[in-house]
Amino acid sequence: MPQASPTSAGHAAENQALEFLQGQGLRLLTRNWRCKGGELDLVMLDTDTVVFVEVRYRLHAGFGGALGSIDGRKQKRLVHAASLFLLKESCWANHPCRFDVVALQGSHHAGRPLQWLKNAFEC
């Protein structure tokens, strides 16, 4: 059986993360929000807090795995994209915000372990 492409594996990881977070009570505002220089995988609402969720999937743990792939450069891109989102979607500008990471590692099959890090980094 052929292995899933990185794109389809990434979409499957985002779908799994979305389903999990909705099960935790978060509400989807938008997904795959793109701007110059970045993309926000999931933008969700947790009560009144806008949550910018970065979904990271890695097949193997090499080079730090899924969590290790969120370096300072990636964090800056996410903060920049979130700032642009709040400028464009000004109805959310006065809400508290946070950055979460959902990390998945291993086979692309359903049921792979998922790690949810709330407030994964400060900006």
Swiss-Prot record:
One Pfam short name: UPF0102
InterPro entries: Restrct_endonuc-II-like (IPR011335), tRNA_endonuc-like_dom_sf (IPR011856), UPF0102_YraN-like (IPR003509)
GO molecular function: nucleic acid binding
Family statement drawn from the similarity comment of this UniProt entry: Belongs to the UPF0102 family.
Matches recorded under PANTHER family: UPF0102 PROTEIN YRAN
Name under which the protein is recorded: UPF0102 protein PputW619_0932
Organism (species): Pseudomonas putida (strain W619)
